[in-house]
Amino acid sequence: PTYDKVAKDLEGTMNVTVRNMPLSSHKNAVPAAQAVQAAELQGKHLEMANKLFQTQDSWKGITNKQTELRGLFLSYAQELGLDTEKFKTDLVDPKTIELIKGDFEYGQKIGVKGTPQFAVNDKPLENVDSSTSAEDMAKEFKKAAGLN
């Protein structure tokens, strides 16, 4: 995805981070955020986030969160080469939930209204979304950071 390329291209120029913003309109947003956060603890948050976006249609309607949804996310963790035992533990760790809550509160504080949303120096960018080209996205990030 475009964001991954931009993050790699800007490495050393800007600190690019991903934050969780599970929206209440998506009933499995919190478990998905937990999966991304658990993967982040093993250095693979972007990979997990991408996997979840790519496969969203297969899990967004799952109602059995304890078994079916966690099992599916565990299979994604295995595909990505994560330590699945650590992933299972981190997935339900209260610290994971607290990190997600912190990200959500931060997003609300700076005015994030949806996902994905991009922000630079605590200011959401209105003219950048997931359909923006990598080149234009990098330009907008640099411009917003005053790095032209």
What are these regions (language model features)?
Residues P1-Q78, E140-A144:
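Structural alpha/beta surface segment adjacent to cysteine/selenocysteine redox centers
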Residues P1-A7, L74-N148:
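C-terminal cap of thioredoxin/glutaredoxin-like
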